[in-house]
Every structure is written in structure tokens, then in C-alpha cells.
Amino acid sequence: MHYASAFAPSPKNARHNLIELRATLEDFRSTTTIPSTRPAPLHTFAGKVENGIVGKFGAEKAQRVIDSWRLLDTEYEHREFFGQDGTDPQTSNCYQFAHSYVPGLTVKPFWDIDEIAWTKKLAKSYKHIRKEFLDVTKDMSKLQQDGNNVWAGALTEEAGGYGEGWSTLVLKDRGIWDEVNCNLFPKTAQAVYNCGIPATEVFFAAMKPSTDIKLHSDFTNFVLTSHLAIDIPENGNNKCRLTIGDETRQWINGEVMVFDTSLMHDAINEADSMRYILMFRIWHPDLTEVENNALQYIYDCLSVPELLDDNEQVRTAAESQIETLRNFPK
């Protein structure tokens, strides 16, 4: 198994699966039963990761993360219908698909931002973030030259989800800040850092005019997605919209949204110019601090497998490397 791509938000088109499942709803309901699991052999990568989680965080406090890791190793995909009462499952898109799955987490299309304190702080920084973004992106050629992977498109295997009209400029990836790009957008990076956002990923996302993002799931339920709308064409005219499950909202400049992309979702830009947002992958609010740290440890092991080396000196050096990479750029 390619763990690095599996244990993370991975936008893949699930429309074909959804059509099949609607035709056999009883089969769909039966797949929501979570199978029993057992530890992977200690000599395998999966076994070493689990052993590391137990050693660092304790089996009891990190049990849901351990279960999630074991389920991934069995190639389990959680499927469940979350449509409101009275919703026709044959026409609804409110289905959850997740192969990176922590059992027992709350599922709802959009979260009330009044319940999430950092969203208010972020919204207050909107004008400064927008101004810096527009100033820096005036000269796209210079930005391309100075930055890392500026406006990179989705990977080939992901194109069925995000499509060719979507591209990103990363500030943080799997808990690691991109020093080069953060230094190009220092006010934005500092604002994000000061807000205390529990983000594993932070990036600007662009969407070309007259394009859409097809119906898909990001296949991970232990992170939610958040958007700060930065530059929305025809702002307020419902030209740029996002649908999570069966609920549709439009992006409005300066507003923050938090939603669950393990549910089927799609998006559209019907305007004649680019749409820009600042996007976050954040830990699910139901997770404990220990669970967040245990999940981050898995990310770290995927990025720096030397963390699992049998040699203590190699492990110590890897831990130092991870700590350095996680530091906020000065």
C-alpha cells in the first residue's frame, strides 16, 4: 500500500461508486459495519508505526487513531448515508466515503463557525491577507520564479476530483511550513499562526473561470476543510458556489466556512475571472489533543521514515529534523 497518499485528504471521483451504491442501498448500509482489526506484524511499516503510537501516546488514549491506522492497512473504506430525514437516498449526495477513517466523529456538511473561536480572529485579518495576496500576485512571473510550486495543479491520479481548473500555492503541508512561500506572504502566514488554527495544511487555492470541480470525496474524516474567501468574482451574485452533500453555499469575500469533505461535494465558478481562497485542512474538533498528536506522528513517519529506524541515533536525528521542519519560519 502507498500509505503516504492513502492516509491524507485525497480527492478522488466517487460518482461511479455512488451510482452503484444507490442501485443497491442494502449493500451500502451493510458496508457501514466496521470490521474487527488486529495489530500488523512488528517487522512491517504499519506495525512499526502502531508500535510507535503506543509507545509515545499510550494504547488507551490513542485507541481510535490505532483503529484508524489498522483499518487503512486492511484497505477498509467507510461508507455511510447522512441525508436528513425525508431525503431520498436515490437523489441525495449526502454520502460519506472515507478510507482514512477515525470511528465516532461527528458528521455534518457545514459547521457553525460561532462554535469555532479561531474563525473570528481569521475573519478580522481578511483585509490584510487580501491586500498582501493581491500585491504579491500582481507579478505572477516573479511569483513563479521566487516561490515553491506556485499554482501547482492536482496530481494526475487526483484529477478526477479537483480537475484542471484548480491549483494551489502551499504555505503549510502536513504540519510543515514552507519557508520560501511563507516569506513571500509573511503577513498571511503570521496571521494564520497567531490565530492558533489547528491546521495540518494551509494553502491558497485558485479556480479558473467557467470551470467546476466534479462530485467527489476527499476520503478522510479526521480533518475538516475551511475556506477564507479572498477574491471572489461577482461577489454575492451566487456565481461561485460550493455544495457539501445536499447543502449549497456561495463564497463571500471575507467570510470563513468550515465543512466536511469526507462527504460528497462539488464546486463551480460560473464567473468570468479567477476565484481565490485561503484553504485549511484542520483537525476534527472531536479529536483529543493526544489523538491530534498521534495522527501528526503518522504524518511525520510517512515524511521521515527514519523515525522508525531500529538505530536510536538515527531516530534521534530524525526527531530533530521533524522538530526543525515544524518550526514557524522567522
Describe every region a protein language model picked out.
Residues 1-13:
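N-terminal chloroplast transit peptides
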Residues 2, 216, 265-266:
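Histidine-centered active-site/metal-ligand motif
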Residues 6, 21-23:
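Proteolytic processing junctions in secreted/extracellular precursors
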Residues 24-203, 207-217, 289-330:
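Fe(II)/2-oxoglutarate oxygenase catalytic core
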Residues 126, 166, 199-201, 210, ...:
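Extracellular structured ligand-interaction cores
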Residues 171, 206, 230, 244, ...:
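Hydrophobic side chains in beta-strands
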Residues 206-208, 218-235:
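Short, conserved beta-strand element in jelly-roll/cupin
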Residues 222, 234-330:
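Catalytic core of Fe(II)/2-oxoglutarate
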